[in-house]
């Protein structure tokens, strides 16, 4: 593929709800561009872009993939993103590399939650937005109903460009409203045909265009209000400018699996979609933390953002990047601004799906890949040593679904950790680590399906079988009553014996773990043994009397005892303290504490009742409600951590994916008696007490 100037490069992310046909649209584009001899089908597992074994097995996109094509002297970098909410991290990666988002909408299902989320994310990332209504050959598809929903959901900026003429249930004629020409698809080919009689509907669509164009400037708005007609040049210029500045959201349509409407879509993109150069510049910070502007200029100092990483044990590591300024080749010196180290570029590639081709260089505005950058991760900035700058990285959603992960074969814990570390290089929404208290390896992701894919990849890529279990809860124990007890340790076994004798007062306090004090008089216990008594208690409180959980909020005061001048030792008094603890705790009204977390659930207004009811069902307390962003409501509550395990699944289901939440530990409080009893019984059955 030849080199293109940034003015002739389009970086377009395909986004939208799962099942809308994003990958099919991309495959149709690849086919029409002459880069494939057939249109890949997801059901057959033979697409260019869904090449990952997990995608082939599940018949759904789970990673972001890139495919450059050439169309009418323009290079289009197609960035196909996942639609499932569990893989939102991939959508953010794809949009970071894009300059516009083509949001694919099902002609049958219409505007889904994934449509809304894609629009919001594109807005947040400053991308131009366009719509493609797909699947119109399905008899259940209803383009005009979907168009009206787009308009009512996203406002008057929604503007029709290509619309179908449906006759006898067939959607194989498409009208370009700008050209005022009709095209028919027959036997795999597109040809111009007579304009169909669409009656008042066509006039209504042209009015929709005028309304959208009128919003692009005050002059055109005045003209529209006065009832004057726009010239064809004004319409084309207004739409082109409006699309690029975001004041117009163009709508295309067709059926990707049959290539219907895809030619017209590609033709329109070459003049409607913003080029890499249209963006003008990106902002970053220099080494002093001061903001700097980096122009999209091939003659500038090199600067690129790494937006995706593939870490495959068989193929090796591959870092996908977008060049903002300059050129990147094997001769380009590059600094990784996160590590401060220079990276050695052995090869520069262009990638189409899993196919790699050597490139002499990748210029400003374009996308490429570099193999074997071992210390580079997604979000890193690579730049010339002569102009050090850090570009905006990628903000990932916080994982909300957590499980404990165990190897099926004992002793393979390190193998699991190594595999997860590699997978986390590819997918930063994976978080994992060892819970030192419960002695479990914990993994967090975006949902059940996300973790299911991780388990499958561990087996297929890193040859380690694992099982997921509900994570253990880190309970605590405390006391509610003041007691005084003796701890006496005496042992005689020939020679020097062991002797330690202490009287300790145990009482509740506000401390985090143990507060140790002494008020011994008359040398009943020598001062030199005080540290041993404290050490014995600190070791002992790691296991409470009820269920073996650590004890907190305990004050222990050593106030009396006795010693033997020969047999007493630090170990003797350490043992005596442990005996006092063991004797005293059951008498001090021990209580089980459970961790409580602070919940903030962002949900649509009509789901507030569902969420509040669910909080109550999970033994939580609703603290209040506040208006949030984008018309959402924020429900604030406190909920026991033990009740939150599957809350991410619940909130996604009840809000159809619109809701989100944050949850973090706040404090411990008494567990209800019935709950405490179950926990204590389980601990006894597991041998923890």
Regions found by a protein language model. Give the residues of each.
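Structural and coupling elements of P-loop NTPases
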Residues: 1-689
């Amino acid at each position: 593929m030849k080199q293109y100037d940034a003015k002739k490069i389009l970086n377009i992310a395909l986004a939208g709800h799962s099942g809308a046909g994003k990958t099919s649209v991309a495959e149709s584009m690849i086919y029409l561009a002459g880069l494939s001899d057939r249109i890949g089908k997801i059901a057959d597992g033979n697409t260019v872009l869904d090449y990952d074994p997990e995608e082939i097995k599940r018949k759904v996109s789970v990673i972001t993939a890139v495919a450059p094509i050439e169309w009418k002297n323009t290079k289009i970098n197609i960035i196909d993103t996942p639609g499932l909410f569990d893989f939102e991290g991939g959508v953010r990666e794809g949009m970071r590399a894009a300059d516009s988002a083509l949001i694919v909408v099902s002609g049958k299902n219409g505007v889904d939650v994934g449509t809304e989320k894609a629009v919001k994310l594109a807005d947040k990332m400053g991308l131009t937005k366009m719509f493609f209504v797909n699947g119109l050959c399905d008899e259940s598809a209803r383009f005009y109903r979907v168009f009206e929903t787009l308009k009512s959901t996203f406002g008057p900026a929604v503007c029709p460009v290509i619309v179908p003429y449906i006759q006898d249930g067939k959607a194989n004629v498409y009208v370009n409203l700008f050209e005022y020409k009709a095209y028919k698809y027959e036997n795999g080919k597109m040809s111009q045909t007579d304009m169909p009689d669409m009656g008042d509907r066509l006039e209504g669509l042209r009015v929709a265009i005028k309304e959208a164009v009128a919003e692009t400037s005050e002059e055109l708005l005045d003209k529209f209000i006065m009832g004057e007609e726009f010239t064809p040049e004004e319409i084309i210029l207004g739409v082109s400018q409006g699309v690029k500045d975001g004041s117009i959201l163009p709508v295309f349509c067709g059926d990707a699996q049959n290539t219907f409407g895809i030619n017209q879509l590609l033709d329109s993109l070459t003049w409607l979609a913003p080029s890499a150069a249209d963006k003008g510049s990106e902002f970053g910070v220099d080494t002093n933390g001061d903001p700097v502007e980096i122009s999209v200029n091939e003659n500038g100092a090199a600067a690129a953002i790494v937006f995706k990483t593939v870490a495959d044990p068989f193929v090796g590591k591959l870092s996908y990047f977008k060049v903002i300024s300059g050129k990147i080749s094997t001769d380009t010196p590059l600094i990784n601004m996160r590590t401060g180290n220079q990276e050695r570029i052995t090869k520069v590639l262009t990638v189409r799906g899993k196919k790699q081709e050597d490139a002499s260089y990748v210029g400003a505005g374009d996308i490429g890949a570099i193999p074997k950058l071992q210390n580079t991760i997604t979000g890193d900035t690579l730049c010339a040593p002569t102009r050090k700058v850090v570009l905006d990285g990628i903000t990932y959603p916080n994982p909300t679904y957590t499980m404990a992960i165990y190897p099926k074969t004992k002793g393979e814990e390190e193998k699991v950790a190594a595999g997860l570390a590699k997978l986390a290089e590819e997918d930063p929404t994976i978080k994992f680590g060892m819970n030192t208290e419960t002695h479990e390896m914990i993994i967090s992701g975006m949902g059940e399906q996300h973790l299911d894919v991780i388990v499958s990849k561990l087996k297929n890529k890193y040859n380690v079988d694992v099982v997921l279990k509900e994570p253990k809860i880190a309970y605590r124990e405390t006391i509610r009553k003041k007691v005084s007890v003796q701890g006496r340790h005496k042992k005689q076994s020939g020679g020097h014996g062991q002797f330690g004798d202490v009287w300790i007062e145990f009482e509740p306090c506000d401390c985090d773990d143990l507060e140790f004090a002494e008020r011994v008089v008359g040398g009943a216990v020598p001062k030199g043994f005080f540290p041993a008594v404290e050490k014995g208690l600190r070791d002992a409180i790691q296991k409470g009397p009820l269920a073996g959980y650590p004890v907190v909020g305990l004050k222990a005061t050593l106030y009396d005892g006795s010693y033997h001048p020969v047999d007493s030792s630090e170990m003797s008094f350490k043992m005596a303290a442990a005996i006092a603890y063991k004797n005293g705790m059951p008498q001090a009204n021990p209580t089980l504490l459970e961790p409580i977390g602070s919940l903030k659930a962002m949900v649509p207004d009509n789901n507030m009742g569902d969420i509040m009811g669910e909080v109550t069902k999970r033994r939580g307390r609703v603290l209040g409600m506040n208006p949030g962003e984008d018309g959402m409501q924020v429900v604030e509550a406190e909920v026991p951590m033990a009740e939150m395990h599957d809350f991410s699944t619940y909130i996604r289901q009840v809000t159809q994916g619109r809701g989100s939440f944050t949850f973090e530990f706040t404090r411990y409080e008494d567990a209800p008696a019935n709950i405490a009893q179950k926990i204590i019984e389980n601990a006894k059955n597991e041998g923890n007490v």
